[in-house]
Amino acid sequence: MASKEMFEDTVEERVINEEYKIWKKNTPFLYDLVMTHALQWPSLTVQWLPEVTKPEGKDYALHWLVLGTHTSDEQNHLVVARVHIPNDDAQFDASHCDSDKGEFGGFGSVTGKIECEIKINHEGEVNRARYMPQNPHIIATKTPSSDVLVFDYTKHPAKPDPSGECNPDLRLRGHQKEGYGLSWNSNLSGHLLSASDDHTVCLWDINAGPKEGKIVDAKAIFTGHSAVVEDVAWHLLHESLFGSVADDQKLMIWDTRSNTTSKPSHLVDAHTAEVNCLSFNPYSEFILATGSADKTVALWDLRNLKLKLHTFESHKDEIFQVHWSPHNETILASSGTDRRLNVWDLSKIGEEQSAEDAEDGPPELLFIHGGHTAKISDFSWNPNEPWVICSVSEDNIMQIWQMAENIYNDEESDVTASELEGQGS
């Protein structure tokens, strides 16, 4: 039996390597930018910071990323990394390759430089790290323990204390177990939600300050789910609304003004397997998406949750991340275990296709990023550079990429997400 499994693993590895070679050969035609960087340790989390600096007389801009480490028994860190991204007029040259560093893709005379600027000691791996929108120096992290940690990275030395001691600015209590979901309220400064394997969602207000030492207790604990809560997200336009998704296959919508924390305002059986992630559309107040172990992304309208608006099908395995583009109302991306990051365009739903095109996927599947050879752990849309995405995978690889303009500029469609709201699937 073991030898059969080994044989299957070898075959799969060979297929993955073959696919990667084909992908790499085609990058000049598919991308305007590709930077591949091998991190010292895999990161389970990635998020662009909102700041960008354009050094005078240079053909690149400086961007920053929040990363974490997932080491094998060595000291873990919360990391802020600096990235050089070329200006539009700098020439991208996909043939530039540095196989020693595991890097390729450059532009002009500048290699895509990525360097760790700040490393802060962390207790165990960083399951997820997210900055506070009102003050991006403040970063919350999910740990392998039940605590959620908060760091102001300006108050920590750039190089970590060799003792390995983790010294967060706040320690948020309320959970019994670890988890992944984490969401700051973009309308109420300091209000943080966290999802946990203990079946609950906790809410903290870090402005309330610690009661003793650095400990802040949860302001509310929401107990509606009957299984591991995988993800949680604040609504982007309503300060009191949030959504949560769980292994009980449910999507729940909560209102913090409600008198009860045990029953959501709305709940729906969202998928036929665990629901792993959700994302509210930044432009349309009623639209959200969920991703699931059933290999689909579902589109929802808050005004009628009984009816699923649309199901996006193309992934071959569990979906763990779904994020709307910050720049385009109809653009959504998803990723997960199948090593693929799919970019979807809602405005193309229902378009006619040739039989040949239909074999590649539905009309709304705009792009498949095939550069990863391991499960994708997280990805983030760059808030300053439209169509630039950073994705990280379990094999230490981080990729910063932008699909070729002719792919998304095909013909600009005028359908908005709000026009799709009335159409059920």
UniProtKB/Swiss-Prot annotation:
SMART domains listed in its UniProt record: WD40 (SM00320)
Any one Gene Ontology cellular component term annotated for this protein: nucleoplasm
Gene3D superfamilies for this protein: YVTN repeat-like/Quinoprotein amine dehydrogenase (2.130.10.10)
Distribution of this protein across tissues and organs: Higher levels in brain, thymus, lung, spleen, kidney, testis, and ovary/uterus; lower levels in heart, liver, and muscle.
Single Gene Ontology BP annotation: positive regulation of DNA-templated transcription
Domain of life from the UniProt record: Eukaryota
Residue positions where N-acetylalanine is found in the record: 2
PTM sites of type Phosphoserine: 3, 95, 354
Cross-link (Glycyl lysine isopeptide (Lys-Gly) (interchain with G-Cter in ubiquitin)): 4
Subcellular location: Nucleus
Role according to the record: Core histone-binding subunit that may target chromatin remodeling factors, histone acetyltransferases and histone deacetylases to their histone substrates in a manner that is regulated by nucleosomal DNA. Component of several complexes which regulate chromatin metabolism.
Subunit structure: Binds directly to helix 1 of the histone fold of histone H4, a region that is not accessible when H4 is in chromatin. Subunit of the type B histone acetyltransferase (HAT) complex, composed of RBBP7 and HAT1. Subunit of the core histone deacetylase (HDAC) complex, which is composed of HDAC1, HDAC2, RBBP4 and RBBP7. The core HDAC complex associates with SIN3A, ARID4B/SAP180, SAP18, SAP30, SAP130, SUDS3/SAP45 and possibly ARID4A/RBP1 and ING1 to form the SIN3 HDAC complex.
PANTHER family membership: WD40 REPEAT FAMILY
Name of this protein: Histone-binding protein RBBP7
Organism: Mus musculus
Gene label: Rbbp7
